[in-house]
């Protein structure tokens, strides 16, 4: 299934919405629309610089019953990857520091408390 520029703009707008909701506006996020193998979207990041690239595939072999819904869910998924990227980076660091790990876990918890509270 080929995706159009219209799909890309919808996806990007959804990402921007979720970045704002999740409090990730301090991140510099770039977007790409290109061919991906076996993925609908992909996020790459450099936590130390708070820079990320979210890539949407130009085509995907699997048809979706509701493409707009799938794109919105995928945008949220990619933004959640950015939210959790500090934890991912710490977990992959062989010089793992429990204090830093706990700090990042609680940062995510505070974000979720704001979103889910009340």
PLM segments and residue spans:
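N-terminal soluble segments of membrane proteins
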Residues: 1, 9-11, 27-32, 38
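Alpha-helix boundary/N-cap detector
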Residues: 2, 6-10, 74, 100
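Ordered, soluble secondary-structure elements with a strong preference for glycine-centered loop motifs
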Residues: 5, 65-70
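Zn2+-dependent metallopeptidase catalytic core
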Residues: 5-27
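Intrinsically disordered, low-complexity boundary segments flanking structured domains
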Residues: 13-19, 38-43, 71
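Catalytic zinc-binding patch centered on the HExxH motif and its immediate surroundings
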Residues: 31-56, 60, 64
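Post-HEXXH active-site segment of zinc metalloproteases
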Residues: 49-51, 61, 69-70, 82-118
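Short alpha-helical catalytic segment bearing the HExxH-like zincin motif
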Residues: 70-78
């Amino acid at each position: 299934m080929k995706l159009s520029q219209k799909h890309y703009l919808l996806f990007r707008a959804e990402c921007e919405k979720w970045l704002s909701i999740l409090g990730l506006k301090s991140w510099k996020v770039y977007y790409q629309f290109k061919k991906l193998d076996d993925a609908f979207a992909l996020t790459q990041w450099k936590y130390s610089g708070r820079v990320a690239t979210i890539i949407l595939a130009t085509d995907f072999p699997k048809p979706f019953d509701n493409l707009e819904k799938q794109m919105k869910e995928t945008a949220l998924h990619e933004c959640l990857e950015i939210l959790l990227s500090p934890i991912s980076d710490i977990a992959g660091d062989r010089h793992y520091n429990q204090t830093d790990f706990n700090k990042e876990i609680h940062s995510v918890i505070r974000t979720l408390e704001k979103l889910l509270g009340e």
